[in-house]
Curated annotation (Swiss-Prot):
It comes from Rattus norvegicus (Rat). The modification Phosphoserine is found at S111, S112. Residues 56-66, 106-116 have a biased composition (Acidic residues). Component of the PeBoW complex, which is required for maturation of 28S and 5.8S ribosomal RNAs and formation of the 60S ribosome. This is Ribosome biogenesis protein BOP1. SUPFAM superfamilies: WD40 repeat-like. Keywords: Nucleus, Phosphoprotein, Repeat, Ribosome biogenesis, rRNA processing, WD repeat.
Amino acid sequence: MAGACGKHHMSPGSLPGKRRLEPDQEPQIQEPLLLSDPDSSLSDSEESVFSGLEDSGSDTSDEDTEEVARAGCDKDNRTEKTSEEQEQAVPPCPRAEEAGALTRDEYEEDSSDEEDIRNTVGNVPLAWYDDFPHVGYDLDGKRIYKPLRTRDELDQFLDKMDDPDFWRTVQDKMTGSDLRLTDEQVALVHRLQRGQFGDSGFDPYEPAVDFFSGDIMIHPVTNRPADKRSFIPSLVEKEKVSRLVHAIKMGWIKPRRPPDSTPSFYDLWAQEDPNAVLGRHKMHVPAPKLALPGHAESYNPPPEYLPTEEERLAWMQQEPIERKLNFLPQKFPSLRTVPAYGRFIQERFERCLDLYLCPRQRKMRVNVDPEDLIPKLPRPRDLQPFPVCQALVYRGHSDLVRCLSVSPGGQWLASGSDDGTLRLWEVATARCMKTVRVGGVIRSIAWNPNPTICLVAAAMDDAVVLLNPALGDRLLVGSTDQLLETFTPPEEPTLQPAHWLEVSEEERQRGLRLRICHSKPVTQVTWHGRGDYLAVVLSSQGHTQVLIHQLSRRRSQSPFRRSHGQVQCVAFHPTRPFLLVASQRSIRIYHLLRQELTKKLMPNCKWVSSMAVHPAGDNIICGSYDSKLVWFDLDLSTKPYKVLRHHKKALRAVAFHPRYPLFASGSDDGSVIVCHGMVYNDLLQNPLLVPVKVLKGHSLTRDLGVLDVAFHPTQPWVFSSGADGTIRLFS
């Protein structure tokens, strides 16, 4: 009956640890609770359980129910109650809402991350399935095929415009399908982007409870009694003490000694014995090994190693020191017929003398990484701007284009060809503005560097022609003609190495203004930086190979009294009164005011072909016909600072850029190589030379490629003229 009474007072909603019933879950029958004492009422523990599960609002009804139950138990303690009495004794069941509020499901928040995973490939990289049509396997072991991705960018754009959920659609890497994020997931992403916590209910700034405060408490935090072992001596500590006592007795542990304040001086060489074995082995230098025998020492050497009768007689007549071999090679039919070596004892004796008398030296081997020997050069893309591609092609000449020159402003381009014409081009459009027929092969052309003078000098045959191109500003063209017409000839004519002649009216209509006639063909013409002096090179053998003409006074002079070889080209120094003269094997720098030789540069080339001076004036480059480009640093040495062998054939022309740290070279291999040449103001830092681009475009004609190169005065552009009759602009 006690069990029955207990059953009457227990309800499924009020049992401790009972799972809360779900709406679609059937209730289970609860086993009766057995009490140990039939005469006693509910225990304290049961009361505490009921008091914890029931709310305060139902205390009165519960007490009444308990009294009725107790009365029923006391009245009939030995008999069983009928079903009607049981129904009256059982308390009413609480509502579903009250049961849910009182009891909480302990598995409510339990979840598994792998319940919703359809791809069961495991923890393997999905990149393994890149080459397969499927992306994994489902729970049944069937393949999960990748969705067809046939949508292009236009479809994606239409989805982006039409689909309102496009911004919250992501791709599942496990299955390859598109997933739509819920509002909770979007809110979670927004919180994480703002640096907040993922749980919206988490308060990081909730008030802290200072459990262990500074106030002295009356009672301890934990009232656990002390262990029994705390009153007994520790066996572990006893073993440690025993081991320490034994170590002290054995002398393993020694007490600390006070430090000795007296300094100690040691004799570094007191312990060394020169006769000791270790001392001898330290300084031992192994003897050099004997050279291995060669083919000549074989008993059956090849026929070319056997000396002839003349060589044998010559060997016998030589002194022993002069002989290359101290024996004569002999041939024997077999090894058993080889006699004993007659000089064996002598050679052993000489070997012993060498080991005894000749000193030995230990050579320290230095291990050098080959990568450290290669200079660390910057990347070409870090050295921009420089020309990288072909921009324009100037077509019009019918033969070799030997020379070209750019106007000081960079708007016009002049070119000379073997077809006897001088053409003037517009740089921006590649349009031929003017064609002047001079009646001869133009070997060199130079535009006056003075921006206030519109004048071009061209060398053809044995004359230098000065012409006014009449392009650009009309005031500039008129002032140039007026400057040439204001010349008054001297009263007493002087003997000059060249003749200045006025052109005819027909030639004047074509643009020609003056003609300077020489005794030999002219190979080069170049202007001084101010535009008043003109230097020419003649193909003669005497001291008149180089002439200097003055435009304002129409005078010519020969600066040298004797010749130092065949002159190839000349150039004026940009800042100093120097004249640079390049011969076949050397470059000489002359001081024009002092009339003396300043420096002589040795390029170590077979034949110098061209030369250019850096705008700062402290560096020079020269090209040669043996495929070398030589860089000279005048402040460093008279020998080359660096030799570049990038071209495969002869170099025809070299040039510096007036503003940018660039220089270029043209060769017969049809290529133009542009290099970065940075010159620093710090004299302790060497120039930086880095090849940055190889420009190709000219076709080889008569085994000739690029004949001349020139830079644009303001832009990082380079012009090249070739044997194919074209001029190309690279930008």
